């Protein structure tokens, strides 16, 4: 049977394939307590952060620039990795491979879970509702307190302004407003 106003059959759904996407951060923002017991959960996804220390780790640099959070929040592992890649790419083009040391200071221990509930026609036959509502793991996050250091970048005096700019760019990838503190040795 053809619907006049839709120009498609009633029983037939559209043939488009809908891709899975990342859930919005407001679903996980207000968590009150940490959930880190990975032995109870099967299949916790691996962290996206590939390297926590980048650059020359043993050199003695005169400037230390630190990015710290202004507010308490949850920072997802892919946001931390995105901030690290942004800062690393910017400072590496200016200071070279051995002109800096970048360190990510937080680790995403907190396991994020999502109880998917089907919506639309016939969802009551498919969905379990709030029965067995523990949820599937969708990722990990770092629980950040206000004033906590997130990323530290050490470099020489000549690249101090570039280090500050690199951390400013990476702060846009994080879900909280950030402070940038410069310390001279």
Language-model features, listed with the residues they occupy:
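Ribosome-associated RNA-binding proteins
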Residues: 2-185
